[in-house]
């Protein structure tokens, strides 16, 4: 049994025509109350990342979405700003086609935390994009600075597609010796085309707070 690349192309072509109607994306980094600037991290949240047609189509067909977050804490200097701390985490959303439910997990320092299983895509989106307080080191009192957030949403990458094919279908099986499965030139070409039709392997977003001084 071979991968159904015809289905993938159909999904990509259909999704490409619906991108203009997607929900507006928002990415927010919200500071705590002023009295807690040196005691609590900001709240990171987003909306609309998983709402466009291409992402929903891919999710409903068993392809996972990965949201990679990187929060940076900077201090403000007279001439230059200085990066003082970073914190990275991932949120992964996967649709179980057989069980007909969405699975949402957060991965921090290689530790996986389940955020729940949901029957609807909207519920899964709310869980994936809801407020999160990352455990980044906090500024000292009197230290002027700001937080900057970098977010990459992987709509579909070549490596992810290969992993999905192995995990969900068992069709790609690398040799035990460690050699890569050669596949076919046609298969690799179609997978590349699917990625391009979807608008690239990643979508990048940024957000930052205003400058503050605890």
Predicted regions located by residue number:
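Positively charged n-region of N-terminal signal peptides that target proteins for export
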Residues: 1-5
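Bacterial N-terminal signal peptides
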Residues: 6-16
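N-terminal onset of structured domains
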Residues: 22-65
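Ser/Thr- (and often Asn-) enriched beta-sheet segments in non-cytosolic proteins
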Residues: 26-28, 92, 204, 211
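Residues at beta-strand starts and edge strands
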Residues: 38-43, 61-67, 87-89, 130, ...
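Generic short beta-strand segments
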Residues: 46-51, 70-72, 152-154
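Structured domain cores in non-transmembrane regions
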Residues: 53-141
């Amino acid at each position: 049994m071979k991968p159904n690349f015809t289905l993938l192309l159909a999904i990509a072509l259909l999704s490409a025509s619906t991108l203009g109607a997607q929900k507006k994306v928002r990415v927010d980094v919200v500071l705590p109350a002023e009295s807690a600037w040196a005691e609590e991290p900001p709240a990171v949240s987003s909306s609309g990342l998983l709402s466009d047609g291409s992402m929903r189509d891919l999710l409903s067909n068993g392809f996972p979405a990965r949201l990679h977050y990187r929060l940076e804490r900077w201090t403000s200097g007279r001439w230059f700003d200085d990066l003082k701390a970073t914190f990275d985490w991932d949120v992964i959303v996967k649709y179980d086609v057989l069980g007909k439910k969405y699975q949402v997990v957060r991965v921090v320092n290689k530790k996986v935390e389940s955020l729940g299983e949901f029957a609807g895509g909207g519920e899964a989106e709310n869980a994936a994009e809801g407020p999160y307080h990352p455990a980044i080191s906090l500024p000292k009192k009197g230290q002027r600075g700001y937080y900057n957030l970098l977010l990459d949403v992987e709509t579909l990458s070549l490596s992810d597609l290969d992993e999905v094919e192995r995990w969900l279908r068992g069709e790609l099986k690398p040799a035990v010796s460690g050699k890569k499965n050669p596949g076919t030139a046609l298969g690799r070409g179609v997978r590349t085309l699917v990625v391009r039709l979807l608008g690239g392997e990643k979508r990048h977003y940024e957000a930052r707070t205003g400058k503050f001084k605890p």
